Amino acid sequence: MDIAELLAFSVKNKASDLHLSAGLPPMIRVDGDVRRINIPALEHKQVHALIYDIMSDKQRRDYEEFLETDFSFEIPGLARFRVNAFNQNRGAGAVFRTVPSEVLTLEDLGCPPVFRELIDQPQGLILVTGPTGSGKSTTLAAMVDHINKNEYGHILTIEDPIEFVHTAQKCLINQREVHRDTHGFSEALRSALREDPDYILVGELRDLETIRLALTAAETGHLVFGTLHTSSAAKTIDRIIDVFPAGEKPMVRSMLSESLRAVISQALLKKVGGGRTAAWEIMVGIPAIRNLIREDKVAQMYSSIQTGQQHGMMTLDQHLQDLVKRGLITRPQAKEYAKDKRLFE
């Protein structure tokens, strides 16, 4: 099998990822579980050749120099793929994350109405958080798609690498890839403020400078979307504040309290009957939440989210209960992700 055939097999079987690892057969991840493909183990030189077939000269140089590299590529008519190539103890390895060619809508994802209300805001910061593989990129792509179809503005994305490719509809869209179109997130964000955007998507808030620039952009009339690998709204606020030196923390709390529109923390769970569905914790930046951020009372946020349903807020446990009630997930699956596991016994 060549790489195109392996990827076609992966897509046909609705796999989220294809794994190539020297010394082992190719494997695919389907509904969260890794499964072997029934073909012989691949040698190092085979995996190396499969990876090199789809790399540009620059990507090959990066791989040789740094022993790992990230990039994306597309097989027309099939899908786009986000690739990480690396080395391991048996030789070459690579993971291909499938990025569907078609962007799912907010309706497709079952997003609650508050998602649309949030992205109708003229400015502020919306954070989508969760572990790797929790569907953050899919949720953000649906938000960008909604804006693209319903608003007249300039959407600027900064990604590493570009995953979903958006075709300009009502909006002007410019998508920039780190290491190809810009040297880094902070450089691209600094430049973005002079590129007349209405909406800015930052693939990942990786460091102090990127977070600082994202807060500044949100304060100065832009709607900014970003991601973090945190698992809850409270942990997200802590992570952002903790990045800054002690002397700057009060100022950052003030900036964040003014600009934060929402934190959406998500997990991806197995659905009854196959497939996966997202479970969300949603914290909206209402005055009570802003005060808690400003006064460094993050521990009290959970109870505010619990009682804030009239504002579109919900805890992860509340959403898990709803998903179980609707028969979309099992109680054991909900219990695995729940904060209060007694709810699902």
Model segments located where?
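Short, flexible helix-loop junctions that flank or precede catalytic/ligand sites
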Residues: 1-345
